[in-house]
Regions:
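Extracellular glycan-modifying ectodomains
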Residues: 1-328
Length: 328
């Protein structure tokens, strides 16, 4: 039968993700989408610890803070409308008192440093090659925090600049954790504020840089989430109403491809078993007091008990026991 779509076929990676592998994700909101799915399936995951960040230079910079475990420079802090923020971080790092945001950032740097010491994988999702520089320092910022536009200059990073920034970061990371492997992705989210034409230019820069880096380093891989959205799914029904962000169905499709490529056979087997348990836990019966539902909960509890030597399922066990108590 003739094929009516251009599906991207993935092959298993030679370096599979194992069960106890630590995975850190950082980058655009697509890093959140993948990271939270990793966490849902009980992998040891640190998801976008520094908040959503779009450009490669800023992504590398916050992770460098994590590697060196040092306070961020004083000149990166700012105050806008009585709120303290930081140019290098997402606005989720904000406070009415400066000492509070400093403490929050330092705690995040410390936890990231600790996680990176033995993490097996780092997933970086680049969102845009467009960057904003402070006019007073010339530094690229992760977030302009709604400050006047005349305080910044906008420019497009070149593929060589992205690669150079990555290589500096890569050298520091590998010195800190020689065993860590890196997955590069380009976010499938479209940046309409740059216009569709310039969004294409930006994504092209990121894609070329990722190709160069994945070709140059054996422990750096490219995962084609961007191409899966544009060339495989290729339909507006897979975009949310803003026509910029992938729907949950699209994210699930890309997630399935991600698992197909990177998960070990043992991990894939666990995912199948965990899906059944998740479905059972989320099930909302019409008549929870029936004997059949009570047996359903007891069966689920047995499945959880069988897995507790592999992963921490105490939260799920507690939840099912609470449901059993209510059904008595």
């Amino acid at each position: 039968m003739k094929e009516f779509r251009t599906e991207i076929k993935v092959t298993p990676s030679t370096q599979a993700v194992q069960f106890k592998t630590g995975i850190l994700t950082q980058g655009s909101c697509f890093s959140d989408a993948i990271g939270h799915r990793l966490a849902t399936y009980k992998l040891r995951t640190l998801v976008n610890p520094f908040g959503v960040i779009y450009n490669p230079e800023s992504i590398h910079k916050v992770l460098q803070y994590g590697i060196f475990n040092e306070p961020v420079p004083e000149h990166t802090y700012l105050r806008n409308s009585e709120v303290f923020l930081n140019y290098d971080f997402h606005s989720e790092f904000s406070a009415l008192k400066k000492e509070d945001i400093v403490s929050s950032i330092l705690n995040t740097i410390g936890s990231t440093h600790y996680f990176l010491t033995d993490a097996g994988w780092l997933l970086l999702t680049y969102g845009t090659a467009w960057v904003y520089r402070r006019k007073d320092t010339g530094e690229i910022v992760a977030n302009c925090h709604k400050l006047p536009s005349d305080m910044f200059t906008k420019s497009l990073m070149t593929a060589d600049e992205v690669s150079s920034s990555f290589k500096t970061f890569y050298g520091q990371l590998k010195k800190f954790n020689p065993a860590i492997k890196i997955i590069l992705t380009v976010s499938p989210v479209r940046h309409l504020k740059d216009t569709l034409e310039l969004n294409s230019v930006s994504k092209s820069v990121l894609r070329v840089a990722c190709h160069q880096l994945a070709t140059q380093f054996e422990d750096v891989e490219y995962f084609p989430s961007y191409e899966m959205m544009l060339d495989d799914l290729r339909d507006y029904r897979f975009y949310k109403s803003d026509m910029l962000h992938p729907t949950e169905d699209a994210e699930d499709y890309i997630w399935e491809k991600f698992m197909e490529r990177y998960f070990s056979p043992e991990l894939k087997d666990f995912v199948k078993r965990w899906k059944v348990i998740l479905s059972a836990i989320r099930h909302k019966p019409f008549h929870p007091e029936t004997a059949s539902h009570r047996q359903f909960l007891l069966d689920t509890l047995k499945k959880l008990d069988d897995l507790k030597t592999q992963v921490d399922v105490q939260q799920e066990i507690t939840l099912v026991k609470q449901q059993l108590t209510k059904s008595s």
